[in-house]
Amino acid sequence: MKNDKSLQGVTSIPGFKACGIASGMRRSGRKDLALVLNTGKNPVAAGVFTSNRFAAAPVLYSRAVLSKGATGMRSVVLNSGSANACTGENGLKDTVATAKAVGTALEMDPRQVLVCSTGMIGTPLPMDKMLSGIETAAASLSEEGGADASWAILTTDNEPKTVHYQADGYQIGGMAKGAGMLAPALATMLCVITTDALLDAETAQKALEVACAKTFNRLDSDGCMSTNDTVILLASGESGKVPSGFTAALTETCAQLARKLADDAEGAQHTVEIAVTEAENEAGALIAAKTISRSNLVKTAIAGCDPNWGRIVSELGTVPESVCPYDPSKVSVLFNGVQVCKNGAAWGSREDVPFDSREVHLEVRLGAGKAQASVLTNDLTHEYIHINADYSS
């Protein structure tokens, strides 16, 4: 069972309040609006956003606001149900109005507010419900509101994803959503991370970029990149600790959240780690691992508990030699520690491969060097098709 701090996520950290409410934006009546407030004396923010060219209005807005000044950033408002993507100028105006409403409700400059949305693309925000919901949310902020906030940002997720990490003299908490459209870069996901570490804006931004590159950008559930992917880091500075190893601690926190996202991938029965080892360089190993992770044939084989190494090497073979050099006659493949391919040919018995747990570890040894890289993915099942066929578009 999770400890209370882990369940609280963003509010497990000194200097933060949050809430999650049902504003009526979702027909189901479930929670759909979250608000996170940094009450610390030294507020700083950082952000990493989708590279999708159809980036949603809240992404464009938050990216622009952060670029003009991350110091003093105090709040994030997040809604589920409407992505506010591909909504034109009105969508951007609605995002600005959302930030202004939060600023008014919390008595702060709207430029201290970041905005995130998730849900249906092309659906305008129901601004009447959004604006009235913001007033309710502002009055509902609590130091114990992190759990409710984590529920309010979900779409097709089965459960919220929250973490708490105790570092040396400071803490990091977080919440994330995402079960489908998980693919670099980032990997649809929204994530808010909080810390009481004392950071400057440059340190926070650099640390977040490194952490995302090593975790969320190595998560590829279904090869589909969202228009709304956003990771926000808020630092309160309440610990007074200027950390020396913050990037490593933040990376571990993000890794825990990435694993939770993979474990809750739409319809998945297996969470799969694909490691490409003995590569000439890490960049090539990473591209090879990502290529294998996006193969529907590999993913369906794993869904059927079939250690089909032929599909793996076939996909590996599509990676250009200039990108990932290796000799096919030296490649080996292991499923859950059991070798099924050695030196580019069948080896051992596929029946020896255990598939008795959700976790599947796939290792591809290139025999070309000492570098390695890994990605997280999942299998592809009938349930994934049902979920996405039934999700209104």
Give the location of each predicted region.
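A structural signal for small-residue-enriched, beta-sheet-centric alpha/beta enzyme cores
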Residues: 2-79, 83-96, 103-393
